[in-house]
Regions:
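Short, well-ordered beta-strand micro-motif
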Residues: 52, 129-133, 152-154
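Extreme N-terminal basic, low-complexity initiation segments
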Residues: 1-11, 15
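A generic structural micro-feature
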Residues: 40-44, 70-73, 120-126, 144-147
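Active-site-adjacent beta-strand/loop module that shapes the phosphate/pyrophosphate-binding cleft
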Residues: 113-139
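Nudix hydrolase/Nudix homology domain
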Residues: 18-19, 71, 140-171
Length: 171
């Protein structure tokens, strides 16, 4: 079956992928998925995040050990946009996954681009930040995810935390 990976010459077939200029000539190079990931040195990641306020407090989430180099730092809830997903829908989905809260996006308050090295790769992050309103749900912690705790903080409290750049923007 055809997938979006066909267009870039990486042909899915079971757990083995092929990298070849001609999609019909799979003899050039045969790679496992792990090997294919290792040769990718430039990554663009588009994410959507929410600023959630409760009176004078902002909701922040602590990054887990699944985020090497940033574990223990605090950030805004949110995450990667899936292929074909609208940014606002991604923010709603990611916030609920990480916090248990259902939110309504109100307005985009920031969109920016950041380039840095992460995990031995050149990473280009494009982030869309929404002001969002809590519409329901109950605050809980994500299990086995990129965050392990979420908590409401006043601006003064948040400034004492180890924050990633996105967390600093949120306060």
């Amino acid at each position: 079956s055809s997938t979006s990976l066909d267009k870039c010459g990486i042909m899915p077939r079971d757990k083995t992928h092929y990298l070849a200029p001609d999609q019909n000539d799979r003899s050039k190079l045969r790679l496992t998925l792990r090997q294919a990931r290792e040769i990718i040195v430039e990554v663009t990641r588009i994410g959507a995040y929410g600023i959630l306020m409760d009176e004078n407090r902002v909701l922040l989430c602590r990054l887990s050990s699944q985020v090497p180099g940033f574990a223990g730092n605090w950030t805004l809830p949110g995450g990667g946009i899936e292929f074909g997903e609208q940014p606002a829908d991604a923010m709603v989905r990611e916030v609920e996954e990480e916090t248990g809260l259902r939110v309504i996006p109100k307005v985009i308050v920031d969109a920016h681009s950041l380039q840095r090295e992460f995990g031995g790769r050149n990473m280009h992050s494009i982030r869309i930040v929404y002001l969002a309103e809590v519409a329901g749900g109950e605050l809980r912690f994500e299990q086995d995810g990129t965050t392990d705790r979420c908590q409401w903080f006043t601006e003064e409290e948040a400034r004492t935390l180890p924050l990633v750049e996105l967390g600093k923007e949120g306060i």
